Amino acid sequence: KREALLRQITGIKKKLESKENREMELELQQLEDELEAIPVEKPRRFFADDCSSEALTNLLANNGGTLSVISSEGGIFDILAGRYSSTANLDTWLKAHCGDPISVDRMSREAEYISNPCLTAILTVQPNVLDCIMANTTMVGRGLLARFLYSFPTSRIGTRTFRTPGIPKEVRDKYRELIFRLMALPMGEEPQTLVLSQRAEEMIADYFEEHEQFMVEEGQIFPDWAAKYIGAILRIAGLLHAADMVEGENEISAETVGRAMEIGKYFLAHSMHAYSTMGADVNIAKAKFVW
């Protein structure tokens, strides 16, 4: 429809170049108003790399509130720490993690409102980057670092082979099929609500009690992260449920929750390692090594 209106507007403007016509001027104004009321369609963005919080808010607003920040470097943390400003701006990241509405009103651009933002971040960074961000009191104090799931794979240096086999084609094809099926899911006006089956809820309740005891005994190392742990397991369960693609089924099974718990235990151990070693005092780190 925009293209048709643009053609009409262009045609009327050409006619008005040669002579004035009040009726045509009114028609032109009406067509321009109609064109302005039609939202501009932009290509969908799925990924972003290094971008400021302001740019991230804009990308979320232009993409239905969803986006992934995927980077193989830690530059995004420099930006968050205030590379382009004197202070760290973490609000968009914090709100997009839990789906809180984002409302931005600034003189320099149009107001932006995102009712249900959803941001995914996948960052592969060197340990020294984690050292720096773990020592950043703003990121720690605002709870940004407690929202990440950490993984510390064992270094393979010294055991690598020159001719490393690639990812099997069958695995690549299945992964590609899964991603495209997920992307094809219709985005409704309102988010779908997932619920736990009775058994799944009982499993989570029991594990919650167990984790609370863990918080007392060992959670002092990373209390902010550990406090969000059960919530992270429920998020993982939701992702697994979506990946299973049971159409029209909004109930998460006990089997799915069990898988989510196993994944969660992996991240619990690795995140505990991150908090106990990254950004720690050098002398404390040496003492832990000796111990």
Predicted region positions:
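Phosphate-handling catalytic cores of nucleic-acid transaction enzymes
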Residues: 1-291
